[in-house]
Amino acid sequence: MVAKGTSAGLLDEARSQSVFKHAILQSYLPRFAAMTGKWAQGNRVVLLDGFAGRGRYPDGKPASGEQMLLAARKIQRTTHVEVMLVEREHKDFLTLSDVAAEYSRLGITAEAFHGEVENYLDEVVHRATGVPLFLFLDPCGANVQYEAITKT
């Protein structure tokens, strides 16, 4: 069996590990944001997906980026959730930007960023000053330098 990387189609469809990961996001994120946002300044919470991919699978099913956007939409009336999505692959970033724009039109604060997540951590932490922050750095992010996470 040969390892399958992102360029070989790993992100083309939801695999069992992704299905499990997305189930956790579906059940945990709305609760996290609603519970922590209830007591936060302006009822505000910041969510980051550091390896968002294109946000949605080609078959239309939500990937991790869209899972965050769906969580924000679910609690939109009571909590202001700011969603930041980072993707380094340009082609996937373009699709991710379109997905984020869809939710922005629905009143969700959503922004897609192109590049390495390490380049955006300072900005994310700055935006989340004084409010709850959920950093999602999934297994694809195994190469994130520990120092980049701990310095912020």
Task: Give names to the regions the model predicted.
Residues 1-3, 43-44:
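Active-site-adjacent bridging/hinge elements
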Residues 110-152:
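Active-site segment flanking the S-adenosylmethionine/decSAM binding pocket
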Residues 11, 23-125:
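SAM cofactor-binding core of SAM-dependent methyltransferases
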